[in-house]
């Protein structure tokens, strides 16, 4: 069962000035802001269930995008941090989220990892799609 903690926590964090947010929240805010400028709408942030947490859940044109955000001190590539165990947890959490939001079950699902360098002067986020996740 999911929690509403994610939605209210995400809204709360978005109101905190970026420099006062913890590093992980800063990275999520950067990715969320970037995607929202591209027309994606944020549905949930830090949504959790017994299987795990979804950092960002967004939608645009009947597409659902789930983003796992990884902060890094540099742009050293980090999608390998999403190992097979983490992928299984992520897939189960996505299934739980979709079960709680049945109106979106027929939307095209995309899952991505965003590697975000902190501080922002280190560059823009890098993206990697995760295929065959769920």
Curated annotation (Swiss-Prot):
<dbReference type="GO" id="GO:0003676">
    <property type="term" value="F:nucleic acid binding"/>
</dbReference>
<dbReference type="Pfam" id="PF02021">
    <property type="entry name" value="UPF0102"/>
</dbReference>
<dbReference type="InterPro" id="IPR003509">
    <property type="entry name" value="UPF0102_YraN-like"/>
</dbReference>
<comment type="similarity">
    <text>Belongs to the UPF0102 family.</text>
</comment>
<dbReference type="InterPro" id="IPR011335">
    <property type="entry name" value="Restrct_endonuc-II-like"/>
</dbReference>
<dbReference type="InterPro" id="IPR011856">
    <property type="entry name" value="tRNA_endonuc-like_dom_sf"/>
</dbReference>
<protein>
    <recommendedName>
        <fullName>UPF0102 protein SYNW1051</fullName>
    </recommendedName>
</protein>
